[in-house]
Amino acid sequence: MIPEFAIREWSEHVPWTESEQVEQDLLICRALTEIYKDEYLASHLAFRGGTALHKLFLSPQPRYSEDIDLVQINAEPIKETYDHIRDALAFLGEPKVKQKKHNNTLIFRLESESIPVVPIHLKVEINCKEHFSVLPMQRMPFSVVNKWYNGKCDVLTYQLDELVGTKLRALYQRRKGRDLYDLYKALTTSDINIDNVLACYQKYMEFVAVSYTHLRAHETSAHL
């Protein structure tokens, strides 16, 4: 999909040594730009997760991150959002869609231009449950400059303290070394307000606890 000369050019801007990682990174950056160039998506989805942390706040990017994590701002049907994402990311082909009650994922599958050819997956995951932010959201400029693609947008995202707070919560939800690494890099290389981080962490943990309580109550009533 991407000419080899464009991949070589992009390798000058990212620290990855494998050609397929450079290629996937460029695809991710274009995908992010196309999503937030769409007026509907730009007002309905917020960018969160490790890729948001690394692409918007930590420079140079310290860790390879291959997913785009988004949060649905308002509680509403997801179909129109799906349609807009499909249109915005048509250059990636048709995605496989995995739907869950509170989480929806579009998976795009491609093959690398590098030899030997390896599969490249780009996952766009939408959280359809946490329709809130603790701190005011913000828009941050993002751009891609490459012979294959040029584009820019304003990405709706969370403040750094809130992103770090959700990373802290992730440590209690899963056992992923990348969460601990992301916390370490953010705390040692950025200007972090620890009080804000802990306040955000507490709010998200309270939300998880309330959601779990409601789930258990629903399961109990279903068996009565």
Question: Language-model segments: what does each one mean?
Answer:
Residues 224:
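Cytosolic catalytic cores of cyclic-nucleotide second-messenger enzymes
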Residues 1-45, 56-63, 68, 72-216, ...:
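Structured mid-to-C-terminal alpha-helical surface segments
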Residues 47-52:
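Glycine-rich beta-strand-to-loop/alpha-helix junction loops that act as flexible
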